[in-house]
Amino acid sequence: MNMSAWALPEYIEDILPAEALKIEMMRRRVLDWLFVNGYELVGPPLLEYVESLLTGSGGQMNLRVLKVVDQLSGRMMGLRADMTPQVARIDAHLLNRKGITRLCYAGSVLHARPSGLTRTREPLQIGAELYGHQGLESDLEIQRLMLQSLAIAGVGNIHLDLGHVAVFRGLIRSTGISPDLEMELSGALQGKDKAALKELCAGLKKQVDASVREALQLLPELYGDENVLTLARSALPSYPGIMKALDELEMVASELSPLVDTLAFDLADLRGYHYHSGMVFAAYTDNCPNAIAVGGRYDEVGKAFGRARPATGFSMDLRELSGLMSSDSHPRGILAPFIKEDKALEKKIEQLRNEGQIVIVALPGHENDAGSFNCDKKLVSENGVWSIADALI
C-alpha cells in the first residue's frame, strides 16, 4: 500500500471514537452553560476572503492563515485561524444591534504552522464574546464565565494570569515612536527578551525620557502576586492611564481570586497587542506548558467592519483540554437481538433509547458479539416481555 494514501500532514490528526466522545460531551456542556448565561450561538464559515479574515486582526494573523484561490471568483480565500474576528464581523455588520450582544461559538480553525511543539494545527475553538459594554462588569462576566467553563470541562488546579496592555501603551504613547518600533518593543516584552529590550531602549536615548526607558525594562520583572501592583505604582510613571489600569487589575483580582487556585499579574503580557485594548488574561493548569484559555478586551476590532464596539471575550481549544482529562471508560451499551416484526422488542428499544441508553441491535450472524460492541447488558424475552439482563463479555 502506498503510504501517502493514509498519511496526514504534520500536526494534523484524526480524532478516534474515545477522544471524539470526550470532546463532544465537553463541547455540549460548555455550550449549554453559555446558553443559560444568555450567549447566542453563531456559526461563521470555515472559509472567507482573506481581506475579511485579516481585517482588524493585525499583520500577525496573515502568517497563520492558510490561503487558497477561489475557483469561482479568482480571489484569494483563507481558512480561518481564529473565530474571534469573524464573530466581531457578525456583531458589527450582520446583527447591528444597538445594545449589548452576547455571542458564543464552537468550531475547527486551521493554522498554517503549529503555535507550539505539542499543539495541533487544527484546534477546536470554543468561546464567548460580549459586545456593547466598556466597564469592568463585562470584563468580570467574561473572565468568570471562562473559569466556570473550564470547571465544567473538568479542569482543576487553575492558575490565572492578568495583564493590561494600557500599561505598556501608556508608556509608549508618551514617546511618539514609530509603529514599527512599538511592535518590536511589544514583541520583546511578550517574549521576555530582556537583552533585546535593553538594546531597543538604548537606541531611544535621544527621543525617550530615561524614566520611560527604565520603566519599559522593568516590565518583564513585574510578574507575581499583589506585590507586583504595589511595586508598579511606585516604580512606573504616574500617568493616569497606567494608574487606572493598575486599579482595574486590583479590582478584578479581588473578585476572581476565590475562583482559582492561584492568581498572578503579568504586566509584560502583550498577547494579541495588535488588537487588544485593555485587560488581557490567560488560564493555566498543571502539567500543561500552554495557556488552556485566553482572552481580553478588544474595543477597536469592530471598527474595521464599519462599527466600533466595546468588546471582550475568551476562547479555548477543546482538543487541548481533552488531552488533559483522564480517559473515561466508553459508556456500556445494551445488546438487542435482530428479530423482524417484533413490535414489543421495537417498543422496548425505543423506550431505552429515549431514556438516553445505548442500544445496539446485533445484525444476523453477530449475536454473540456483545464484547466487541462494548455491551455489558442484553435484552432478553420472557413470556413475551422484554427486559434487561447481564451479558457475558
UniProtKB/Swiss-Prot annotation:
Predominant place of localization: cytoplasm
Keywords: Amino-acid biosynthesis, Cytoplasm, Histidine biosynthesis
Subcellular location: Cytoplasm
Pfam families: tRNA-synt_His (PF13393)
Pathway(s) it belongs to: Amino-acid biosynthesis; L-histidine biosynthesis; L-histidine from 5-phospho-alpha-D-ribose 1-diphosphate: step 1/9
GO biological process, alphabetically ordered: L-histidine biosynthetic process
GO CC aspect terms: cytoplasm
Alphabetized NCBIfam families for the sequence: hisZ_biosyn_reg, PRK12292.1-1, PRK12421.1
UniProt record similarity statement: Belongs to the class-II aminoacyl-tRNA synthetase family. HisZ subfamily.
Function: Required for the first step of histidine biosynthesis. May allow the feedback regulation of ATP phosphoribosyltransferase activity by histidine.
Subunit structure: Heteromultimer composed of HisG and HisZ subunits.
Other facts: This function is generally fulfilled by the C-terminal part of HisG, which is missing in some bacteria such as this one.
Annotated protein name in UniProt: ATP phosphoribosyltransferase regulatory subunit
Native source species: Nitrosospira multiformis (strain ATCC 25196 / NCIMB 11849 / C 71)
Gene name, Swiss-Prot/TrEMBL: hisZ
